[in-house]
């Protein structure tokens, strides 16, 4: 009868929850599994959010079941609807990099930090490894894109950042996108922390349009929390996304993206550190 069916469904659900926790699943990963039609995340206040998927935004084109790690630990995609490439994200924190070994390890491209705006002083700073990394990557037939960590407060500062980046990349053959990196500074205050979603979106658009006008492909780097809470995604539909999402077998992001950063602790021959 109906009551028996309800009790059976309840027992099945409780058994699922118990088995997931016994196997080490986190509360968040379990909630994501239980609510497949929502975007589940934890906001900056520490509260769980169950957001509806926005039908106005282009959906991801990738088959989640087609993602897998190969014998080298690198993420691969076997879907027939796209050809994928393996890349690494580098900054001065990686110290010495042997790009010949990196190329031999199967890396197709490198996203290299060219600089940043200091989150306290607001000064524009070049990454001290940018020139060396870029020169040696290109020398070893690794395609290069760049990213810049933004702390712009308005359109004018965003354009200033973009023009600074264009000056830095001018000597090089940059074949991959130029990304604006927007994310929070953990455990410290930072210039952009009080910007509204509308204001930060203005910053991103101003940066991207300046990059695009110079003949490069703009890209927006961020994580799930920032894409959901800190920008107006509908206004950013015309720009490619570089999604950072870790500890999942496939990207936990329902919307269209061009690049996925799937770990912050990866290792590859030729690079010291993560």
Feature locations, PLM:
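Substrate-binding cleft of extracellular glycoside hydrolase catalytic domains
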Residues: 80-204, 212-214
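Surface-exposed substrate-engagement region within the catalytic domains
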Residues: 45, 53, 168-178, 182-274
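A generic local structural motif
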Residues: 74-75, 97, 227-230
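Gram-positive cell-envelope targeting signals
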Residues: 1-2, 211
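Functionally critical loop-and-helix segments that line ligand-binding/catalytic clefts
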Residues: 12-87, 94, 234-274
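Compositionally biased, low-hydrophobicity segments enriched in charged and small polar residues
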Residues: 9-10, 102, 230-231
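Mixed-charge, low-complexity intrinsically disordered regions
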Residues: 4-8
């Amino acid at each position: 009868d109906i009551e028996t069916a309800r009790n059976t469904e309840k027992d099945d659900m409780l058994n699922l929850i118990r088995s997931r926790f016994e196997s080490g699943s986190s509360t968040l990963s379990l909630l994501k599994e239980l609510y497949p039609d929502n975007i589940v995340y934890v906001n900056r206040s520490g509260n769980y959010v169950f957001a509806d998927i926005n039908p106005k935004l282009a959906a991801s084109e990738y088959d989640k079941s087609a993602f897998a790690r190969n014998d080298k630990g690198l993420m691969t995609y076997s879907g027939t609807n796209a050809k994928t490439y393996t890349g690494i994200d580098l900054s001065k924190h990686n110290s010495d990099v042997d790009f010949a070994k990196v190329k031999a390890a199967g890396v197709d491209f490198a996203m290299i930090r060219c600089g940043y705006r200091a989150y306290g002083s607001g000064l524009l700073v070049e990454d001290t490894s940018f020139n060396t990394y870029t020169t040696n990557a290109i020398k070893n037939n690794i395609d290069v894109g760049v990213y810049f960590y933004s702390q712009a407060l308005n359109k004018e500062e965003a354009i200033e950042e973009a023009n600074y980046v264009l000056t830095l990349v001018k000597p090089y053959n940059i074949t991959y996108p130029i990304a604006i990196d927007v994310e929070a500074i953990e455990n410290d205050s930072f210039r952009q922390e009080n910007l509204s979603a509308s204001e930060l979106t203005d910053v991103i658009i101003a940066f991207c349009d300046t990059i695009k006008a110079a003949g490069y492909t703009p890209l927006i780097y961020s994580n799930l929390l920032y894409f959901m809470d800190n920008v107006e995604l509908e206004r950013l539909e015309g720009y490619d996304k570089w999604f950072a999402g870790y500890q999942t077998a496939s990207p936990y992001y329902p919307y269209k993206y061009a690049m996925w950063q799937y770990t912050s602790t990866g290792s590859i021959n030729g690079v010291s550190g993560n």
